[in-house]
Amino acid sequence: MANRPLVPGVYVPTVAFFAENEDVDVATVEKHAAYLAKSGVAGIVVQGSNGEAVHLDREERNLITSATRHALDSVGATSMPVIVGTGAPSTRETINLCKDAAAAGGDYVLVLPPSYYKSLVSSAALLDHFRAVADASPIPVLIYNFPGASAGLDLSSDDILALSSHPNIIGTKLTCGNTGKLTRIVAQAGPSFLTFGGSCDFTLQTLIGGGAGVIAGTANIIPRACVRIMELYRAGRVEEAQKVQAIVARADWLAIKGGFVAVKSALQSYRGYGQQPRRPCVAPSSEEAAALKEAFSESIELERQLESQ
């Protein structure tokens, strides 16, 4: 069992940080994690889709995980959990990455379904994959349903509910955006199974459906605004939550369209670090970066207001 509890809230799938030569920029990894720890979020995810996991080798994955844990501990966030993305094309590699994640300081793992040979893997074999990973993983597992990152493979609510009874599978992230699926899972899974929305543009809808919160890439840029939606909803101030949700949804659409490259560009514009991706991905041109900066300005204004309170 993990030492740090997974609680409802906003979790940030952090972007990976690189120097100009594309080496991992450990100092910026730690700087960003420390910044997020002070923003009210519930935890951090590394090696997710925003974290360029597919651009990292095994040693680099472990380096980023351990640096993130070190940064959180250094600012007193010793109880804040780190979730580590460990999806891989084979069951064997996924298990090895889960073991690595635990050894490097991870508390939970987030596992995409294997999709490279999607047509050769039956539904039964797919469920067996997740069960085998959960059996072998030294830390608890969250199922990551993101058709856009898994060749269109979209786990159904039946699939996820079938896996929810496994004692080492404790939740799911639904980046499919299907709130009906989310509601069905919440209603039928046990109370200890946490269901998270995978984008902050439907945070309020996730909460209304009974979800535990969101794991949202745009929270790299506007963590307090994302947290504020949950605070207002929990306080019964739904109309105010709707207004904040609208601003956050507009910002999230920019991130959805531009991917992690857009998120990194906004971080560079507003926090002075983070733009460099790994090839073949490239940073936006100066004109594109300026346009993104302007487009994110509405949500950044809200974020700064919340930060000053």
UniProtKB/Swiss-Prot annotation:
Keywords: Lyase, Schiff base, Stress response
Top-level division of the source organism's lineage: Eukaryota
GO molecular function: (4S)-4-hydroxy-2-oxoglutarate aldolase activity; (R,S)-4-hydroxy-2-oxoglutarate aldolase activity; 4-hydroxy-tetrahydrodipicolinate synthase activity
Taxonomic lineage: Eukaryota, Fungi, Dikarya, Ascomycota, Pezizomycotina
Binding site for substrate: 49-50
Record-annotated site: Involved in proton transfer during cleavage: 144
Induction note: Down-regulated when grown with elevated levels of potassium chloride.
Record comment: activity regulation: Inhibited by divalent cations.
PANTHER family: 4-HYDROXY-2-OXOGLUTARATE ALDOLASE, MITOCHONDRIAL-RELATED, DIHYDRODIPICOLINATE SYNTHASE
Enzyme Commission code: 4.1.3.16
Organism: Emericella nidulans (strain FGSC A4 / ATCC 38163 / CBS 112.46 / NRRL 194 / M139) (Aspergillus nidulans)
Keyword Glycoprotein among record annotations: no
Catalysed reaction, written as an equation: (4S)-4-hydroxy-2-oxoglutarate = glyoxylate + pyruvate; (4R)-4-hydroxy-2-oxoglutarate = glyoxylate + pyruvate
Family: Belongs to the DapA family.
The protein's name: Probable 4-hydroxy-2-oxoglutarate aldolase, mitochondrial
Function in brief: Catalyzes the final step in the metabolic pathway of hydroxyproline. Involved in osmoadaptation.
Catalytic site: 173
